[in-house]
């Protein structure tokens, strides 16, 4: 069973490398300042992300509508 097929799991997608500079500028941060997501996370594995990728997580909520989060994929040794 794919983890992402469960209705409670938010959508995960890899941000293309050429879009990362715009994202960093928009939020006024450095790439190392993103919250971290381990390479061993089941959804990181499922979407095929690699260390250094930025993953966009879109969560749906009855109260908040939709919220977007970004995470930096890091190795397990962090």
From Swiss-Prot:
Compartment(s): Cytoplasm
Catalytically driven reaction(s): RNA(n) + a ribonucleoside 5'-triphosphate = RNA(n+1) + diphosphate
Keywords on record: Cytoplasm, DNA-directed RNA polymerase, Nucleotidyltransferase, Transcription, Transferase
GO cellular component terms listed in the entry, alphabetical order: cytoplasm; DNA-directed RNA polymerase complex
Transmembrane segments: none
GO molecular function: DNA binding; DNA-directed RNA polymerase activity
InterPro entries: Arch_Rpo5/euc_Rpb5, RNA_pol_subH/Rpb5_C, RNA_pol_subH/Rpb5_CS, RPB5-like_sf
E.C. number: 2.7.7.6
Quaternary state and interactors: Part of the RNA polymerase complex.
Official protein name in the record: DNA-directed RNA polymerase subunit Rpo5
Species assigned in the record: Methanococcus vannielii (strain ATCC 35089 / DSM 1224 / JCM 13029 / OCM 148 / SB)
Lineage: Archaea, Methanobacteriati, Methanobacteriota, Methanomada group, Methanococci
Recorded name of the encoding gene: rpo5
């Amino acid at each position: 069973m794919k983890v992402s097929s469960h209705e409670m799991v938010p959508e995960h997608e890899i941000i293309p490398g050429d879009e990362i500079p715009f994202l960093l500028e928009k939020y006024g941060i450095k790439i190392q300042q993103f919250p971290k997501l381990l390479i061993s996370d089941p959804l990181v594995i499922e979407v095929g992300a690699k260390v250094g990728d930025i993953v966009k997580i879109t969560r749906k909520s009855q109260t908040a509508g939709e919220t977007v989060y970004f995470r930096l994929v890091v190795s397990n040794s962090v």
